[in-house]
């Protein structure tokens, strides 16, 4: 990543047209959700088909929540993802094990970023793992209190949680994340993107 560039991840990708559009609009990464119960969940086969058509220039990130280590690694390989995003309460050894195979975005909530929190410190000290801050309920569309998080937000971390075309520039100006991730505010309906919102979001990030 070039100095100062904020990377853009369009998460909850479920269709090839949406993936191709996001890539053409300038997305750096696409997110495929494999977490049980998600309205945006895809199979490894679906994600693989999209990944192979989009090509290697755009990162493909598999999103998991509370799944076994074996399931994460098997699904990631079958889907041909290039990185893994991990949600939920997980031991450090689990995260480190995944990081032995793939770059990891480890998602934590605001309360876990407080000074002295063991999880946040462990994430920052684990090779191949980057912290991502998200809302307690991912995909809810509710933004975080960015100003309150300034003292706790580690440099080099990613930001998610209620980001959209209308507020991402302010979020970037406040926290200076290495990357931003959006889902619900880029959709026409769960799992289906609003092309204009995707373009506006990416443009707002690139201009920040």
From Swiss-Prot:
Gene Ontology molecular function: any one: phosphoribosylanthranilate isomerase activity
Pathway: Amino-acid biosynthesis; L-tryptophan biosynthesis; L-tryptophan from chorismate: step 3/5
Catalysed conversion reaction: N-(5-phospho-beta-D-ribosyl)anthranilate = 1-(2-carboxyphenylamino)-1-deoxy-D-ribulose 5-phosphate
Range of residues in the leader sequence: none
CDD domains in UniProt: PRAI
UniProt keyword list: Amino-acid biosynthesis, Aromatic amino acid biosynthesis, Isomerase, Tryptophan biosynthesis
Top-rank EC class of the record's enzyme: isomerase
Family annotation (PANTHER family): N-(5'-PHOSPHORIBOSYL)ANTHRANILATE ISOMERASE (PTHR42894:SF1)
Family from the record: Belongs to the TrpF family.
Name of protein: N-(5'-phosphoribosyl)anthranilate isomerase
The organism of origin for this protein: Deinococcus radiodurans (strain ATCC 13939 / DSM 20539 / JCM 16871 / CCUG 27074 / LMG 4051 / NBRC 15346 / NCIMB 9279 / VKM B-1422 / R1)
UniProt gene name: trpF
